[in-house]
Design a protein with these regions (language model features):
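CN hydrolase (nitrilase-like) catalytic-core segments centered on the catalytic cysteine
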Residues: 55, 61-150
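Short helix-loop capping/hinge motifs at secondary-structure junctions, enriched
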Residues: 14-17, 138-140, 160-161
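A short C-terminal boundary segment appended to hydrolase-like catalytic domains
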Residues: 157-184
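Active-site catalytic loop in hydrolytic enzyme cores
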Residues: 1-76, 89-98, 164-168
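Short beta-strand-to-turn element immediately C-terminal to the catalytic PLP-Schiff-base lysine
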Residues: 8-10, 133-134, 152-153
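Active-site/binding-pocket entry motifs
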Residues: 24-25, 88, 118, 158
């Protein structure tokens, strides 16, 4: 099987970090269904890369739906999160913006989310709408449904500022899990 891998390159073109997607996109959306695990193996470790600008947490696409991963990256030192994605049109319309803004707010991180757009293999349609989100959850730049480049000026001091205003990472506490309810 293959790995759905995100690579981070330095300014000399050398690979300085590799992340293998942990959560496989195995879903049934009604008209569309996907079983990413049929062709890809899942990763087993979170990746935090040191960059000249600070810690960068690296994830991929469907990982976005698992907030504990992002909280762990932020608590380990990430001030920025990279989330390259290929959300489907139905899931993108419903969830893309709110999930990215939530991860930025929960972690107090900048979120960089490049997103595939268009129709692939004549059937799979991806949403696009690349985003850059600040630690307060404000969208700084957004792409559309066609290929393009987005950019935004960022102030990394906004990470500390957001975390001082709402110090949820410091307030995080362990807790006992509830017993599972019986299901029919």
């Amino acid at each position: 099987k293959l790995a759905n891998r995100s690579l981070l390159f330095d300014d000399a073109g050398e690979v300085v970090a590799e992340y293998d997607k942990i959560h496989m996109f195995d879903v049934n959306l009604g008209a569309e269904s996907y079983r990413e695990s049929d062709n890809f193996t899942h990763g087993e470790r979170a990746v935090l890369a040191e960059t000249p600008w600070g810690g960068l947490g690296i994830t991929v696409c469907y990982d976005l739906r698992f907030p504990a991963l992002y909280r762990a990256l932020a608590q380990a030192g990430a001030g920025m999160l990279a989330i390259p994605s290929a959300f489907t049109v139905p899931t993108g319309r419903a969830h893309w913006h709110v999930l990215l803004r939530a991860r930025a707010i929960e972690t107090g991180c900048f979120v960089f989310a490049p997103a595939q757009c268009g129709t692939h293999y004549g059937r799979r349609r991806t949403y696009g709408h690349s985003l850059i989100v600040d630690p307060w959850g404000e969208v700084l730049a957004e792409g559309g449904e066609t290929p393009g480049v987005i950019a935004a000026n960022i102030d990394l001091g906004a990470v500390a500022e957001a975390r001082v205003k709402v110090p949820s990472l410091r307030h995080d506490r362990p807790f006992a899990l509830p017993a599972r309810l019986a299901t029919e």
